[in-house]
A protein has these predicted regions:
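Accessory cap/linker subdomain of secreted extracellular hydrolases
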Residues: 148, 197-201, 209, 272-382, ...
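Cap/lid segment of the alpha/beta-hydrolase catalytic domain
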Residues: 155-249, 603, 641, 647-648, ...
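Short beta-strand/loop motif that positions the catalytic acidic residue
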Residues: 382, 388-390
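Alpha/beta-hydrolase fold nucleophile elbow
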Residues: 252-264
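C-terminal, loop-rich substrate-recognition/catalytic regions characterized by aromatic stacking residues
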Residues: 429-443, 447-817
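N-terminal cap/lid segment of alpha/beta-hydrolase-fold proteins
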Residues: 117-180, 614-616
Length: 904
């Protein structure tokens, strides 16, 4: 959700961070300097506006207390007007007759508050005119004005870093019929999307070069758009509905239908909009999206203080009223240039919801709050055709997007592409080709053969700018059979015959230049999870063994859980275009080995288990888990499982990670879990509910599952599979995490082999991965380095210590959720759809052993062993730039000024 922007000068960056910290401390009390309009006096009658479960007003006297009255005259809410003269009442029941009352008994006229039905209460709002080129404002159903810019294919947008003048010369000379009406796409996000210079973090230019008009729209509460910001609230989603229907009615829009396109924020927003199925929405193509908030913000139950928290801080900063130092820079530029509408629209920006308080209040899964924000809970409602692309190792949104494929059941016209790589690799040449075909067929209603000429001609320029490749590194589009069809019907038939899931392997090794965004080969499947997948188990054993055979003897090993043992992140350079997104020559990996003296658990900071060399090629596609029988010296401990490939040449390649806070170890075996599916052996789903939080039992081993994120990796015969268990940190470019450690590191012990009184009947520590049987690997080992977002290094063995002592074993506490158990979902084989063996039985058996905290079974009410005060202290350090990031490393994705990014 970030991109290659110009860094702020250090002084301005520091000033904005300090300003943000002060704002947080004063509860967002309206410190912005912008003055909009002339605030009303107490004698003026306020003008109220009824919205969807909201009432709002502007031009009110600052600091006045305003009451919201229902039809009976009863005060249902009251609050103070902010410094901009705005007030917003949320969570208001639908109904007529609401009024606002100012001091002195001055009241507004009555207004109606509406429910969240998709259809507007007055569809004449869609009759407004949208000019076919340039900048303007569109009015939504509740009167809020959204800023937009229309980019026609004859006047392409930019990537925010400028499109060379040769494009201006290409278009007129191709003889392409770029005449109205135009096939049209909408790009919708909370970044500076509508800026006339070209969208920040947008990809409108790519659609322009495909022959599409693009309408770039800024969400309410951002930039020059009116309204107040709240992360994907209902009104933001209904605004998208209104934008779609309004744009589709314009005479310059071909077929009076539109598609949606965008990457990251602009991809996620499509899922939220499409759940309402606007009648004029023809297709969506979400790229590099999230699946749920927890899998990005709270992986495994602990806070992502790296990218995710900083992204939230960016949203807080961007949603403030525009001034010389706050809000989105383009809005201030517009105001300074005389844009009175933009100035007036700042009046509600001070009513933005406190996003940091929302994070604090939802550290655990609360369905009523979380489900509306998690695409996995509602994508089944989407009926429009879908093209989606995501990366297993996406350094920003994370690798859980593929789970959406199994839940997107509302349409049979859906195609998914998955690969290893970085955030922008959903724009790799092969994926871009296929997305172009999709839009041509479902939005333009045209065969893609003619306009593909321009796309192929400009692709090297697009690739160079999107990924920041060096001059002379030319990446072109591959041949495409769909584009060879001469008629629309033939092209559509060929496209719809494509398998629904494409997995590209060894991305970065398919071009003569190592690291270019080109995969070595691909396989296709009918669904995700792959129906043929087999849950394949390797058991952990003594001396770091990882074997398909169960160990006959019990052994104990361990390590010191120390979050500071490795750097917080594994990349030291620019994490955008020209750095992490570039080719191998531009990478700056710092993937550090864990310290290991080999002399005991008090000095080791990790343990690892590694297989013998594989005798056959082994392809893994899907999730998986490390199941551990674990003991901790502290009431809680954070765990990270890292999967790597150890090659015969002595190098080690990163594959994927998984996370869990041990107090969140209870699994959810119902289809009402936060992922809306029950736990299986291959995909254990953490409950994450506060009621299911339990400290670790004292001096006792207990089962803990570490769910792995999605992966797609080819292990060639002769390679070995390794799993390393440690504290979080050091395996991600920009993800970092808070810590449970209460002043000193935890001593963690892992029991391998049979445990407990029942021995072989109890679960053993093991690694389970989804292996696709009989899958060919047609290429040789990729160079090291070359795989995108999969760093490699020289393999270094860890000497797991052997620890003495008795193995006392206890099952997990019972799950306290009361939902009906599910039989699971998704077709698999060889038991891969069964509940996690042993661990599932432990959950239902119940009975926690004695607690680390004098018998108290649960952690404090926050559900975390880190207090919110401590978290705010860590947050302050982040904001002031003294903790995880320096301005040079993270500034390009924090507090941006001006256009300069393709995706965030």
């Amino acid at each position: 959700m970030s991109g290659p922007a110009r860094n702020l000068p250090m002084r301005r960056t520091r000033r904005r961070r300090i300003a943000l910290l002060c704002t947080l401390a004063m509860a967002f009390a309206g410190l912005a300097a912008t003055t909009v309009g002339s605030p009303a006096t107490a004698a003026d009658s306020p003008v109220a506006h009824g919205s969807v479960n909201q009432v709002w007003a502007t031009d009110l006297p600052p600091d006045a207390t305003v009451a919201l009255l229902d039809q009976a005259g009863t005060t249902v809410q009251s609050k103070k007007v902010d410094a901009q003269g705005g007030v917003l009442f949320r969570e208001v029941a639908a109904g007529p007759g609401y009024r606002l009352r100012l001091p002195g008994q001055v009241e507004s006229a009555p207004v109606t508050v509406h429910d969240d039905a998709a259809e507007p209460w007055d569809d004449s709002v869609y009759d407004q005119t949208i000019k076919p080129d340039g900048y303007g404002y569109l009015t939504t159903r509740d009167g809020t004005q959204l800023a937009y810019t229309v980019h026609l294919p004859t006047h392409p947008a930019t990537l925010g870093i400028g499109v060379p003048s040769e494009l201006e010369n290409i278009l007129p000379n191709l003889g392409l019929p770029y005449l109205p009406p135009y096939p049209t796409l909408i790009e919708y996000s909370g970044y500076a999307t509508a800026t006339p210079k070209g969208p920040e973090s947008g990809i409108a230019v790519i659609a322009n070069l495909m022959g599409f008009a693009v309408v770039d729209v800024s969400m309410r509460g951002t930039g020059c758009s009116g309204g107040a910001f709240d992360f994907f609230e209902t009104m933001q989603n209904l605004d998208a509905y209104d934008v779609i229907e309004t744009v589709a009615r314009q005479p310059w829009v071909k077929g009076h239908k539109v598609g949606m396109m965008g990457i990251s924020y602009g991809g996620i927003s499509q899922l939220f909009a499409a759940q309402y199925n606007p009648p004029s929405l023809a297709a969506i193509a979400p790229l590099s999206t999230i699946a749920s908030v927890p899998t990005t913000l709270f992986p495994g139950g602990y806070l992502n203080t790296g990218f995710a928290l900083n992204w939230a801080l960016d949203r807080v900063a961007d949603s403030k009223p525009a001034s010389a130092t706050t809000g989105q820079p383009y809005a201030w530029e517009q105001i300074q240039a005389g844009d009175t509408t933009c100035a007036a629209n700042q009046a509600m920006h001070g009513q933005a919801l406190d996003l940091l308080a929302k994070i604090k209040a939802n550290q655990h899964y609360v369905p009523a709050t979380a489900d509306p924000l998690d695409p996995v809970t509602f994508v089944h409602k989407i009926k429009t055709p879908v093209f989606m692309a995501c990366q297993w190792e996406d350094e920003q949104t994370g690798g859980y997007c593929p789970v959406l494929a199994r839940h997107m059941t509302g349409t049979d016209k859906k195609w998914f592409t998955f690969t290893n790589g970085v955030h922008t690799d959903s724009l790799d040449p092969a994926t871009l080709n296929r997305m172009f075909d999709f839009f041509q067929l479902y939005v333009a209603d045209e065969a893609p053969n003619l306009k593909s000429i321009l796309l192929k001609g400009t692709a090297p320029l697009i690739m160079q700018q999107a990924f920041g490749l060096p001059q002379g590194d030319t990446v072109t589009l591959p041949s495409d059979p769909i584009q060879g069809k001469l008629t629309y019907d033939a092209a559509l038939k060929a496209f719809e015959a494509l398998p629904r899931v494409t997995v590209r392997f060894d991305n970065g090794a398919g071009d003569q230049t190592p690291g270019n965004p080109v995969a070595a080969y691909e396989h296709t499947y009918s669904a995700m999870p792959v129906p043929e997948q087999q849950a394949t188990t390797w058991y952990m054993g003594k001396n770091g063994a990882l074997s398909p055979s169960k160990p006959g003897q019990t052994s104990v090993t361990g390590y010191t859980s120390d979050a500071k043992a490795t750097p917080a992140t594994n990349f030291t350079g620019n994490t955008g275009a020209g750095g992490l997104w570039g080719n191998a020559s531009q990478w700056s990996w710092n993937w550090v080995q864990h310290p290991d003296s080999g002399t005991g658990a008090t000095k080791n900071t990790a343990v690892s288990f590694v297989t013998d060399p594989l005798t056959t090629d082994t392809t893994v596609v899907g999730t998986g888990a490390a199941y551990l029988n674990l003991r901790s010296s502290t009431p809680d401990v954070d765990l990270m499982a890292t999967i790597t490939e150890v090659r015969p040449d002595g190098t080690e390649t990163y594959v994927q990670s998984g996370y869990v806070r041990a107090s969140n170890r209870v699994l959810d075996h119902t289809d009402s879990s936060h992922m809306k599916q029950a736990s299986t052996e291959l995909e254990p789903i953490l409950s994450l509910r506060a009621a299911d939080v339990h400290t670790m039992p004292k001096d006792t081993f207990t089962p803990v599952a570490v769910p792995l994120y999605y992966q797609g990796h080819a292990y060639r015969a002769g390679s070995r599979i390794r799993v390393t268990i440690s504290a979080p940190h050091g395996d991600q470019p920009i993800w970092a995490f808070d810590s449970t450690e209460p002043g000193k590191p935890s001593q963690v012990a892992i029991a391998t082999g049979p445990v407990g009184e029942k021995k072989q009947d109890n679960p053993m520590s093991r690694l389970v991965l989804p292996v696709i049987p009989d899958q060919s690997i047609p290429t040789d080992y990729p160079p090291c380095p070359s795989l995108r977002n999969q760093p490699c290094r020289t393999y270094q063995a860890i000497d797991n210590p052997v620890l003495p002592g008795e193995v006392v074993y206890a099952a997990l506490p019972k799950q306290k959720s009361t939902s009906t158990p599910s039989s699971g979902s998704g077709g698999t084989s060889s038991g891969s759809n069964a509940s996690p063996a042993g661990h599932a039985d432990a959950v239902s058996a119940g009975g926690a052993a004695s607690s680390q905290t004098d018998g108290a079974d649960s952690l404090p009410s926050t559900g975390s062993s880190v207090t919110w005060t401590a978290l705010l202290a860590a947050l302050a350090a982040v904001v002031l730039g003294t903790q995880l990031w320096t301005a040079g490393r993270f500034g390009h994705r924090r507090m941006r000024r001006g256009a300069g990014t393709i995706a965030r």
